[in-house]
């Protein structure tokens, strides 16, 4: 019998990176059930190698020939490859950030790895999903794994509460999005492939505009929950505060990356054929997201909640590139998302390391950290300055490219709001830096006074430090090499958007 290289309309080579991770997931499950706990630590290396191999195959596929299939439910184009690669980076760094934390917490490492791989696989499929069924299935795979990760610390009441809130809000947002998809299915004459839906919408001009507005609103609300846009952000601070810190680090970048890829694909493909006013609606959401996220972040006393509201504001910046609906706009969102992964995971890495040594994440407890642990304080300073958009770090150039693309697209008010709120964000980032660099011993927090000074070494002492070093180098070097990165992003978008 002839061996087919196509399964349900998906070229098998296209999903080879996901297949590697599925193999790692199944292997981890089998080993977890068959071996004693003391013999399972090496499985971390297997999954790390699997993530690296998956990323390498994505690099080999980039800018290659896009497979043509009879039922293209999944697209392996350069656009999806770029975002899937970002998710691989986020997962790999999150795994490194998690190992020491989980060992200290005394919970099952294998379960965490299984949930992490499940979320990674769901996010990667979501980046290339090209029909309504695949989109919703991938979204639920990512969502269910994320809910389990949020409630991973079963003995922690806050973690259980975070998982419950995340489940309820995530389920509601998925239901709203599915309702919007059902209207889209009807308007297009029963089509589920995105390109075929567009063909159906072209001939749906006779439909009542109210129905189109209902469809548009439901989809925007559903996507808004996924990327934590205001006013659909209420779940984010509570879930971030209650979930284990490594889980928060992963959710803050991986789910946002997958949500951004889905949003761009739907907006570039379908929205122009629904209503012309969608840009105005998204501009209002983007302005609210940037303003609320940054203003509320100023009042926070917990590093995790502060980074949660910072993550909300970053979603507003990313929306500038999406709303511009230009090649440079989409490319700027991709570039900033890649930079954001490193600087945000690096900041969370510092919070994790400080928490492992002190047991707290309150901002005031970082007081005087520089004199006790200058390396950790310097790393956190670099990440916060990059998040604030201070040169010469990568975050500055990423924001400049975003704002430039918005200005070129005529989004003057939105760009001005972005610049203004970016200046506001510098205040609360610098406030934390100022607290760390106090020199008076009487101003030191009790946690810093009892801080165990680590052994000085040129080599990282833990997986958390390894991930932090990678993020710190990336946050610094990417600012210097920003032009090649922008060129790669532009090439990715130019080769994809006409066929997205």
UniProtKB/Swiss-Prot annotation:
Enzyme class: translocase
Upper taxonomic lineage: Eukaryota, Viridiplantae, Streptophyta, Coleochaetophyceae, Coleochaetales
Provenance organism: Chaetosphaeridium globosum
Location in the cell: Plastid, Chloroplast thylakoid membrane
Binding partners and assembly: NDH is composed of at least 16 different subunits, 5 of which are encoded in the nucleus.
Entry EC number(s): 7.1.1.-
Family matches, as InterPro entries: NADH-Q_OxRdtase_suN/2, ND/Mrp_TM, Ndh2_N
GO cellular component: chloroplast thylakoid membrane
UniProt name for this protein: NAD(P)H-quinone oxidoreductase subunit 2, chloroplastic
Protein's membrane topology: Multi-pass membrane protein
Molecular-function annotations in GO: NADH dehydrogenase (ubiquinone) activity; quinone binding
PANTHER family, sorted: NADH DEHYDROGENASE (PTHR22773)
Keyword Chloroplast set for record: yes
Function as written in the Swiss-Prot or TrEMBL entry: NDH shuttles electrons from NAD(P)H:plastoquinone, via FMN and iron-sulfur (Fe-S) centers, to quinones in the photosynthetic chain and possibly in a chloroplast respiratory chain. The immediate electron acceptor for the enzyme in this species is believed to be plastoquinone. Couples the redox reaction to proton translocation, and thus conserves the redox energy in a proton gradient.
Catalytic activity field: a plastoquinone + NADH + (n+1) H(+)(in) = a plastoquinol + NAD(+) + n H(+)(out); a plastoquinone + NADPH + (n+1) H(+)(in) = a plastoquinol + NADP(+) + n H(+)(out)
Keywords assigned: Chloroplast, Membrane, NAD, NADP, Plastid, Plastoquinone, Quinone, Thylakoid, Translocase, Transmembrane, Transmembrane helix, Transport
């Amino acid at each position: 019998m002839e061996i087919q290289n196509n399964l349900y309309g998906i070229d098998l080579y296209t999903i080879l990176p996901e297949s590697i991770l599925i193999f790692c997931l199944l292997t981890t499950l089998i080993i977890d059930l068959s071996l004693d706990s003391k013999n399972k630590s090496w499985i971390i290396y297997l999954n790390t190698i699997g993530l690296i191999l998956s990323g390498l195959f994505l690099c080999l596929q980039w800018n290659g020939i896009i497979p043509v299939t009879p039922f293209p439910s999944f697209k392996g184009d350069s656009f999806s490859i770029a975002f899937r690669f970002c998710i691989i980076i986020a997962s790999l760094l999150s795994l490194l950030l998690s190992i020491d934390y989980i060992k200290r917490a005394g919970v099952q490492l294998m379960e965490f790895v299984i949930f992490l791989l499940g979320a990674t696989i769901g996010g990667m499929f979501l980046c290339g999903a090209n029909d309504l069924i695949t989109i919703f299935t991938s979204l639920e795979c990512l969502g269910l794994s994320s809910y389990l990760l949020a409630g991973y610390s079963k003995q922690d009441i806050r973690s259980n509460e975070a998982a419950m809130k995340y489940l309820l809000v995530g389920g509601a947002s998925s239901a709203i999005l599915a309702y919007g998809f059902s209207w889209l299915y009807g308007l297009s004459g029963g089509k589920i492939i995105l390109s075929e839906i567009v063909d159906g919408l072209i001939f749906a001009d006779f439909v009542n505009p109210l129905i189109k507005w209902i469809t548009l609103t439901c989809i925007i609300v559903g996507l808004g929950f996924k990327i934590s846009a205001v006013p659909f952000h209420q779940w984010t601070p509570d879930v971030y505060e209650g979930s284990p810190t490594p889980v928060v680090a992963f959710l803050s970048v991986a789910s946002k990356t997958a949500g951004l890829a889905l949003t761009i694909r739907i907006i570039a493909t379908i929205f122009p054929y629904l209503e012309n006013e969608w840009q105005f609606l998204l501009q209002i959401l983007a302005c609210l997201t940037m303003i609320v996220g940054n203003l509320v972040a100023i009042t926070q006393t917990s590093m995790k909640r502060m980074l949660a509201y910072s993550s909300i504001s970053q979603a507003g910046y990313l929306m500038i590139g999406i709303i511009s609906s230009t090649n440079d706009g989409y490319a700027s969102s991709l570039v900033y998302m890649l930079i954001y992964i490193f600087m945000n995971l690096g900041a969370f890495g510092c919070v994790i390391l400080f928490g492992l040594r002190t047991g707290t994440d309150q901002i005031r407890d970082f007081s005087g950290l520089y004199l006790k642990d200058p390396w950790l304080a310097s790393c956190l300073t670099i990440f916060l300055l990059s998040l604030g958009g201070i040169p010469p770090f990568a975050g500055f150039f990423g924001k400049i490219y975003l704002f430039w693309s918005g200005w070129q697209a005529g989004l003057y008010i939105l760009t001005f709001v972005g610049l203004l709120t970016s200046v506001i964000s510098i205040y609360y980032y610098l406030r934390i830096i100022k607290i760390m660099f106090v020199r008076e011993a009487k101003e030191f927090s009790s946690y810093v006074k009892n801080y165990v000074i680590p052994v000085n070494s040129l080599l990282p002492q833990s997986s958390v430090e390894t991930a932090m070093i990678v993020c710190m180098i990336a946050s610094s070097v990417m600012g210097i090499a920003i032009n090649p990165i922008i060129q790669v992003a532009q090439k990715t978008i130019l080769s994809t958007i006409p066929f997205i």
